[in-house]
């Protein structure tokens, strides 16, 4: 079966949920394909989502990091969704709330069967903090591929940018093919075609291809 191209510009807001338990209440079960976006509260997650979907306000950007406490779900089509997870690791958030978020993030990564890939966004100037590594480890332990996206790459000169990209790739090399590392700039559009190509591939996991092949053969 030929792999179709997903038009990420068609993404539209579906629901918000305070945690994974409520997510199951709002969505039609743990089915279809989900791609999650996770990152520290200042990693530029909302800006990246808006740039990738070419929508200025699909994901609301906040001038106060740590404000996004909800899981926000955006629908690509009847089978595919983008999931904007709460930002983590912001110092001004109360410890109890911070721990609750981190527990919810871990639950989502470990228990969500329809999760096809995770984009872990990191400011290219401050990559691989402890919580970033924890997110990557959780995902890989659950056999979920990861795209480590180094955001705000326009903030560095080309030589410094590639030096950081290579250092991060080396640091994550033990994860093998489970983790890809790419630079990205929401402002300049740097890396956008590569990221969309990876997301498109994740939108077509093998189980879905097999399911569609079976449906085609029965018609």
Swiss-Prot record:
GO cellular component terms, semicolon-separated: cytosol
| InterPro entries in UniProt | G_ENGB_dom (IPR030393), GTP-bd (IPR006073), GTP-bd_ribosome_bio_YsxC (IPR019987), P-loop_NTPase (IPR027417)
GO MF term (any one) = metal ion binding
Query: Which SUPFAM superfamilies does this chain map to?
Result: P-loop containing nucleoside triphosphate hydrolases (SSF52540)
Chain segments annotated as coiled-coil in the UniProt record: none
Residues reported to bind Mg(2+):
46, 68
Instruction: State the Gene Ontology BP annotations.
Output: division septum assembly
User: What are the alphabetically sorted keywords of the record?
Assistant: Cell cycle, Cell division, GTP-binding, Magnesium, Metal-binding, Nucleotide-binding, Septation
UniProt cofactor(s): Mg(2+)
**Function (record text):** Necessary for normal cell division and for the maintenance of normal septation.
**Family, per entry:** Belongs to the TRAFAC class TrmE-Era-EngA-EngB-Septin-like GTPase superfamily. EngB GTPase family.
Full protein name:
Probable GTP-binding protein EngB
What organism does this protein naturally occur in? Shewanella sp. (strain W3-18-1)
Gene name for this UniProt entry = engB
């Amino acid at each position: 079966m030929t792999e179709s191209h997903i038009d990420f510009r068609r993404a539209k807001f579906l629901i918000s949920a305070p945690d994974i338990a409520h997510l199951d209440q709002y969505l039609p079960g743990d089915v279809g394909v989900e791609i999650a976006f996770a990152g520290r509260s200042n990693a530029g997650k909302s800006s990246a989502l808006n740039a990738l979907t070419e929508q200025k306000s699909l994901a609301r950007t906040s001038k106060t990091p740590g404000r996004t406490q909800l899981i926000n779900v955006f629908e690509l089509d009847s089978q595919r969704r983008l999931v904007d997870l709460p930002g983590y690791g912001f110092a001004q958030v109360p410890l109890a709330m911070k721990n609750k978020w981190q527990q919810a993030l871990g639950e989502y990564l470990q228990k969500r069967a329809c999760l096809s890939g995770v984009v872990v966004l990191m400011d290219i100037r401050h990559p691989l903090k402890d919580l970033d590594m924890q997110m990557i480890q959780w995902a890989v332990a659950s056999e979920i591929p990861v795209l480590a996206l180094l955001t705000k790459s326009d903030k560095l000169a080309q030589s410094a940018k590639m030096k950081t990209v290579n250092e991060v790739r080396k640091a994550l090399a033990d994860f093998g093919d489970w983790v890809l590392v790419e630079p990205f700039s929401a402002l300049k559009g740097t890396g956008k075609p590569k990221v969309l190509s990876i997301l498109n591939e994740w939108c077509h996991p093998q189980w879905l291809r097999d399911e569609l092949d079976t449906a085609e053969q029965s018609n």
